[in-house]
Curated annotation (Swiss-Prot):
Record EC number: 2.7.1.127
Top-level taxonomy: Eukaryota, Metazoa, Chordata, Craniata, Vertebrata
Listed result of changing residue 416 to A: Loss of kinase activity
Family membership: Belongs to the inositol phosphokinase (IPK) family.
Biological process (GO), any one: regulation of synaptic plasticity
Means of activity regulation: Activated by calcium/calmodulin.
GO molecular function, one term: calcium/calmodulin-dependent protein kinase activity
Protein's name in the database: Inositol-trisphosphate 3-kinase A
Family annotation (Gene3D superfamilies): Inositol polyphosphate kinase
Modified residues (Phosphoserine): 137, 197
PANTHER family for this protein: INOSITOL POLYPHOSPHATE KINASE, INOSITOL-TRISPHOSPHATE 3-KINASE A
Free-text function comment from the UniProt entry: Catalyzes the phosphorylation of 1D-myo-inositol 1,4,5-trisphosphate (InsP3) into 1D-myo-inositol 1,3,4,5-tetrakisphosphate and participates to the regulation of calcium homeostasis.
Region (Calmodulin-binding): 287-295
C-alpha cells in the first residue's frame, strides 16, 4: 500500500491552501533575488531623497524652526535593516508543498507582525535525523552551531538616525516574507543527532544533511518503494565547501511554530557488527562513562569506575535498559516546544504510563492533532508491512519524527537511515520477533504497535 505524499492534513506537492480566506502567503525568495530587490529599492530611495533635499532645506529656518503655515515634517522613521550573509547557489529541485491549513490560523487581535524584529533565512531546515557512528556519542544533542551557515538573511529594527545621514544608514525597505531564523527554529535538529550535520540549502523547502553512503543508498531505494510517502523526499547529492550533502525535504516547511518530538524506534540502537568489532577492538569512552554516572552513579561496574570509562555498546545497552527501548521497542529522545525550548530529559522514561504522560503534555489537549498522529501511525504501519525495502533491511537507530502546530496540522515521518543495513540475499525480518544475537531482528514493528496502542489509549481519555 502506497501512502499519499504527506500526513493527514498535509497538501500534496504543488502548493497549499492559505491559512485563511484572503490571506495569501508571500512567495519565498532566494538570497540572489533579495539582493536584486535590495539594490533596486536602494536606488529608488536614493533618487527620492536627492529630489526631496532642496525642499527640506528651504523649509527650515536657521535654528531648525519650521516657518508658520508649513506642515511640520514627520520624524524620521525607524527603518528595518537587512543583513545578507554569503549567498549559496540556488538548487534546482522543486520543494514539496507545505501542509494544508485545515482551519483559520490568524495572528492574535491587535498584533502586527511588522512591529516585531524579524529574521529571515533562505531556507527552512528540518530534522531528518543523523546517523551515529561507532566512535561517535549517541547523545551529542541540541547543537545550534549550524545557525552560522551561509545563506542566512536577518531583518532587524534599524536605528533612528538623523535626516542628514538617514539615507546612508538605510539598508532596505523591501517587503519580504517572514521565515523563522535557523538558530531559533532549528536548534532542535540535533535532538538525536550529531553536531554540524545540517546546513541551509539556499532553497525554501529543502535542507542539506552531511552525506553518508549508507543513508544515501537507503534514501535512493526508498524513493522507489512503498515507503516513499513516509520519509523525507530525497533530491540527490550536492557539493558544498568540498563536502557532499544529501538534499532532503524540509519537514517543517508549512508549519507555524512547530512542536517536534523525536522517537527512536527499535529494541536496540547498535548493529550486531558493532558488538563484534567492539569485542575485537574495545575502545573506552570517558564521555559515556560521565553520562552514565550523571544518570546513575551505581550503574558502572567496579572495573568501569577504576577505568573511568565504558565502551559504546556497554553504554548503549545500559541506556536502552533504563529507557523504554527494551520493554516497549521505542524511546523518546527529545521534544522541542513551540516557544523554542527543548528537552532531552527522557533517559529514564520507561513505563507505558510515563510515555503516555509525555505525549499528553506534547499534544497539549489538541484532540485533532492526536487523531491525525494516530491515523498517520496506522498508515505507516500498514505500509511497512508491505514494503519490500523494510522486509529486507535491518533498521537500526531510525526515528519517527512527530511535528504539529497550533493550526492543528500534524505529520509523522521515518527519518535517519545511516545505520539501516541490507540483509544477506534471501533473508527477511519480521521486525516483531525478540532479538537474539545473530537473528538481526530490530523490533521496529513491536515498537510501533506499542506506540499506536499508547496513543489510542490517550485518545480514549
Amino acid at each position: 500500500m502506497t501512502l499519499p505524499g504527506g500526513p493527514t492534513g498535509m497538501a500534496r506537492p504543488g502548493g497549499a491552501r492559505p491559512c485563511s480566506p484572503g490571506l495569501e502567503r508571500a512567495p519565498r525568495r532566494s538570497v540572489g533575488e533579495l539582493r536584486l530587490l535590495f539594490e533596486a529599492r536602494c536606488a529608488a530611495v536614493a533618487a527620492a531623497a536627492a529630489a526631496g533635499e532642496p525642499r527640506a532645506r528651504g523649509a527650515k529656518r536657521r535654528g531648525g524652526q519650521v516657518p508658520n503655515g508649513l506642515p511640520r515634517a514627520p520624524p524620521a522613521p525607524v527603518i528595518p535593516q537587512l543583513t545578507v550573509t554569503a549567498e549559496e547557489p540556488d538548487v534546482p529541485p522543486t520543494s514539496p508543498g507545505p501542509p494544508e491549513r485545515e482551519r483559520d490560523c490568524l495572528p492574535a487581535a491587535g498584533s502586527s507582525h511588522l512591529q516585531q524584529p524579524r529574521r529571515l533565512s533562505t531556507s527552512s531546515v528540518s530534522s531528518t535525523g543523523s546517523s551515529s557512528l561507532l566512535e561517535d556519542s549517541e547523545d551529542d544533542l541540541l547543537s545550534d552551531s549550524e545557525s552560522r551557515s551561509r545563506g542566512n538573511v536577518q531583518l532587524e529594527a534599524g536605528e533612528d538616525v538623523g535626516q542628514k545621514n538617514h539615507w546612508q544608514k538605510i539598508r532596505t525597505m523591501v517587503n519580504l516574507p517572514v521565515i523563522s531564523p535557523f538558530k531559533k527554529r532549528y536548534a532542535w535538529v540535533q535532538l538525536a543527532g550529531h553536531t554540524g550535520s545540517f546546513k541551509a540549502a539556499g532553497t525554501s523547502g529543502l535542507i542539506l544533511k552531511r552525506c553518508s553512503e549508507p543513508e544515501r543508498y537507503c534514501l535512493a531505494r526508498l524513493m522507489a518503494d512503498a515507503l516513499r510517502g513516509c520519509v523525507p523526499a530525497f533530491h540527490g547529492v550536492v557539493e558544498r565547501d568540498g563536502e557532499s550533502y544529501l538534499q532532503l525535504q524540509d519537514l517543517l516547511d508549512g508549519f507555524d511554530g512547530p512542536c517536534v518530538l523525536d522517537c527512536k524506534m527499535g529494541v536496540r540502537t547498535y548493529l550486531e557488527e558493532e558488538l563484534t568489532k567492539a569485542r575485537e577492538r574495545p575502545k573506552l569512552r570517558k564521555d559515556m562513562y560521565k553520562k552514565m554516572l550523571a544518570v546513575d552513579p551505581e550503574a558502572p561496574t567496579e572495573e568501569e569506575h577504576a577505568q573511568r570509562a565504558v565502551t559504546k555498546p556497554r553504554y548503549m545497552q545500559w541506556r536502552e535498559g533504563i529507557s523504554s527501548s527494551t520493554t516497549l521497542g521505542f524511546r523518546i529522545e527529545g521534544i522541542k516546544k513551540a516557544d523554542g525550548s527543548c528537552s532531552t530529559d527522557f533517559k529514564t522514561t520507561r513505563s507505558r504510563e510515563q510515555v503516555l504522560r509525555v505525549f499528553e503534555e506534547f499534544v497539549q489537549g489538541d484532540e485533532e492533532v492526536l487523531r491525525r498522529y494516530l491515523n498517520r501511525l496506522q498508515q505507516i504501519r500498514d505500509t511497512l508491512e508491505v514494503s519490500e525495502f523494510f522486509r529486507r533491511h535491518e533498521v537500526i537507530g531510525s526515528s519517527l519524527l512527530f511535528v504539529h502546530d497550533h493550526c492543528h496540522r500534524a505529520g509523522v515521518w521515518l527519518i535517519d537511515f545511516g545505520k539501516t543495513t541490507p540483509l544477506p540475499d534471501g533473508q527477511i525480518l519480521d521486525h516483531r520477533r525478540p532479538w537474539e544475537e545473530g537473528n538481526r531482528e530490530d523490533g521496529y514493528l513491536l515498537g510501533l504497535d506499542n506506540l499506536i496502542g499508547i496513543l489510542a489509549s490517550l485518545a480514549e481519555r
